[in-house]
Amino acid sequence: MSGNLLRRVRVAEAEPVANRIKRFRLVDTGNAPLSQFSGGSHISVVMRSGDRLMRNPYSLMSSPSDTSSYEISVLNVDDSRGGSRFMHENVTAGSELEIGQPLNLFPALKTARKHVFIAGGIGITPFMSMMDELDGLHSDFELHYGVRSLEDAAYCRELQSRYGARVNIYRQDKGQLIPLTSVLSQQRLGAHMYVCGPKPMIDWALQTAMLLGWPSENLHSEQFSTPPPGKPFAVKLVRSGREIIVRGHQSILEALEQHGIDAPFLCRGGACGQCATSVLACDDFIEHNDHYLTEAEKVSGKKIMICMSRIQSGSITLDL
């Protein structure tokens, strides 16, 4: 019912690669091959700090053809609820972690005539494995990567060295912006655009493409959102007959997991729909923070994405 089975791994390498960004290489604790994955996949990393249980999704950036290890990059964000800070401050070479099996909600479609990647900041990570995979298939692609500065950017030199003119870097500190309208206007019929980065960048890229007449089925995006904090509230579970308190820094899903309650999830970012749960009663306004439910579904108040959304106070009764 819930997300995939966990696997114990050891951190073989942990190193800074840019301002506030660390790269972690993970291997099986028994040195067995890890599960196969495709470009664009991510894993959930389980972190335990005291009585807190955290699970953060991170894109796999290593080569899909090499399952001897996985590589992820973690940005230490200012408004972290603890996960990225925990990885930066507590996880070093030799540390052991639990991870979920790879999941791909952001694949490069093999039928596309060309792949146009638009990345911002840490949003470069899913494209690392996608480009490796497509390069092996001799598929046509190009990358447009927006960064604040070279000090804040990860893997610029590595990407340019490997892929040459297919990689385009735009530095904000040099006044450079991705010329998106020009980039998209030059693409041939059958090209697909993929964007990953901050939400404003994703919205800008998708809106620009649609204004230029790109079909919606040729547009793909991924954003790993974290549920915003709030005030504590109660969750009543009808089927299990339990009531739990969701603390201010927790999502409903995290609170359920902390109390040993099995609940559905996959992406943990409000995008896949797996954790959509029926609301039977609610004392207060639901703060819908997901990207999955339609506006009509949100207004109805009959569904909630327990990985991202919450109420402001009181209690909510769920069909769990």
Regions found by a protein language model. Give the residues of each.
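Short flanking/linker segments adjacent to small metal-binding domains or redox-active Cys/His motifs
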Residues: 173-175, 247, 309-320
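Short, surface-exposed secondary-structure boundary micro-motifs
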Residues: 48, 102-103, 280
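FNR/FR-type flavoprotein reductase catalytic core
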Residues: 2-3, 85-241, 245
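Ferredoxin-reductase
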Residues: 2-96, 147-149
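Short, charged low-complexity linear segments at domain edges
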Residues: 236-259, 278-289
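Local cysteine-cluster metal-coordination motifs and their immediate loop/turn environment
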Residues: 126, 261-285, 296-313
